[in-house]
């Protein structure tokens, strides 16, 4: 009986243990039987698939009712149009991750066996927002397709998706030919890239005195170098690590031996004949060279890797096989390296990689690949916040820092900052006033290289009438933009207004130069002294004072400091006044004088005289007027005619003494005083009636000193 009860208790304990969750090594289970070293913690409930999709949804996409499947959510484009070639991923395959955690073989091989529809099923079963992308009902409705790159699932746009359209899954059409995203080439291309990167890293870590015949180190044992080499590959395409490649394929083994490529290398053996023939070197004029096959179009090895490949200090340069005559050339570009020269010689610095579209040459092949995106329009770097895409990784990183408000390259001379070192260098040319980029045909210099490239296109145009003549004056213009700016001269339109003073300008560049007068910014500094100027023409005129350059007038020989002042000076000799006033017709030689004159026609005259109240538009005009109110200093008396010829009139001041007389002796007033009233009708003249017995001397005395009117009461005294 007791034995039965013990068996019953042991059965209950076994049942209870079976219901409890199994503990693994990650939860602190001790295999020696001592128990758990760490207890279980409360795990919060996992979020639903819709919540995960909302959290991982890129910018420019939104969730909404699907038109392909009723009562289901779909992914809609609500931002900028999605261009073909846009790539999202790698996707997190939910089923594969669960099976991998349980120790079961993943179902990627099963999906691959099902063909392209297996990838569609895997995309629908992913754990991100791509699980809500519905299938299209017809092939014509599909615009996105699942693709695999190095056995990792991605989602790619293969048709233009306009705003307001739903993203619908459909396998990528096979008529587009082999591409990087198809499963047939991604594995071999990834193996080729890892082989290339590993060999370059092995050459880098090898010592200079190492024998070339010694096999290179196994890449599996150099994990830090392998990680560094993997990071050198462009982030546009993420390839698996060396461990994953070694699991899916045979061990790579030594790649270089006795200076030749190992013919038994598994990576080379796995490559198809097209890739093997394309990995051959383009021979240099001296007959030697080496190359490594790049993964595919768009894979950009780092500049540091290309520099190592071109370095003459490499001690184990591989020699590639000669391509077979009948081998088919594929679209994979090659990385070629100059042969190592003698000791002490510098590497070749020629720009050997030339663009077939525009003829621009580059030092490194990776730079040529980046430049090719300009012509193809391929922009693999997509901003998930605003939806803008870039073809350059440097510009993309600077754009992402701009969302955070970070500009890591400030200008040391002003308060501006930039996101890239290239933009900062172009800006610093503005402070120096230099124009380092000169046209080799006409000699015109520019401060920026893009401006020079645009200028060179004007020389490529044949000598023919300009396609954009002005309909008003017939002047030929280069393009429509120049014509629009020119038409503002005829229409008088000035669309660019200054927010500080309200002054209008025809061109935006003139407004920017004018705003510096308000902000006090002086970016143009003189290289000879400490002066700075807000506009570049002012700096050029100032530089003449240091160089001693002068412009002589051909008429009078006067030296002027700039051509603008010389032209204005020549108008003084010719009598030309090309700036007339539209209101009164008065003309001037300079536009600045005309603008100053136009202010006199304004009704508002803020500068008024405190004495007489007369108004003026300019302060200098008011100061000139106030000089007329100042009392004149006493001066020498003018000569007077003889008293015998005509009577003499003398004005008396406030002092009792007389200031001027017609004789040397003092004149005394007579007893007879005649009062005369002078009116305006007599034209500022008065007549004193003559008496036959009166003396010829008369004295005029003002009754009230200081009056300016002519209607005054004066006293005329008869001298005895």
UniProtKB/Swiss-Prot annotation:
Q: Residues bearing Phosphothreonine?
A: 322
One GO cellular component from the entry? nucleus
Residue ranges annotated as zinc fingers (C2H2-type) are 353-375, 381-403, 409-431, 437-459, 468-490, 496-518, 524-546, 551-573, 579-601, 607-629
Task: Write out the ranges of the annotated region (Disordered).
Answer: 201-350
Offer one example of a GO biological process linked to this entry: regulation of transcription by RNA polymerase II
Database matches in SUPFAM superfamilies: beta-beta-alpha zinc fingers
Q: Which CDD domains match?
A: PR-SET_PRDM17
UniProt subcellular location: Nucleus
Q: Name the keywords, alphabetized.
A: Disease variant, DNA-binding, Metal-binding, Nucleus, Phosphoprotein, Repeat, Retinitis pigmentosa, Transcription, Transcription regulation, Zinc, Zinc-finger
Q: Which Gene3D superfamilies match?
A: Classic Zinc Finger, SET domain
Swapping residue 541 to C leads to an effect described as:
In RP72; decreased localization to the nucleus
**Positions with biased composition (Low complexity):** 287-296
Q: In what ranges is there compositional bias, type Polar residues?
A: 275-285
On tissue specificity, the annotation reads:
Highest expression is observed in adult retina; abundantly expressed in the fetal eye. In the retina, it is detected in the outer nuclear layer, especially cone and rod photoreceptor cells, ganglion cell layer and both outer and inner plexiform layers (at protein level). Expressed in retinal blood vessels (at protein level).
Q: Which Gene Ontology molecular-function terms are recorded?
A: DNA-binding transcription factor activity, RNA polymerase II-specific; identical protein binding; RNA polymerase II cis-regulatory region sequence-specific DNA binding; zinc ion binding
Stated role:
May be involved in transcriptional regulation.
Associated condition reads: Vitreoretinopathy, exudative 6: A form of exudative vitreoretinopathy, a disorder of the retinal vasculature characterized by an abrupt cessation of growth of peripheral capillaries, leading to an avascular peripheral retina. This may lead to compensatory retinal neovascularization, which is thought to be induced by hypoxia from the initial avascular insult. New vessels are prone to leakage and rupture causing exudates and bleeding, followed by scarring, retinal detachment and blindness. Clinical features can be highly variable, even within the same family. Retinitis pigmentosa 72: A retinal dystrophy belonging to the group of pigmentary retinopathies. Retinitis pigmentosa is characterized by retinal pigment deposits visible on fundus examination and primary loss of rod photoreceptor cells followed by secondary loss of cone photoreceptors. Patients typically have night vision blindness and loss of midperipheral visual field. As their condition progresses, they lose their far peripheral visual field and eventually central vision as well.
Protein name (database record): Zinc finger protein 408
Species, as recorded: Homo sapiens
This protein's encoding gene: ZNF408
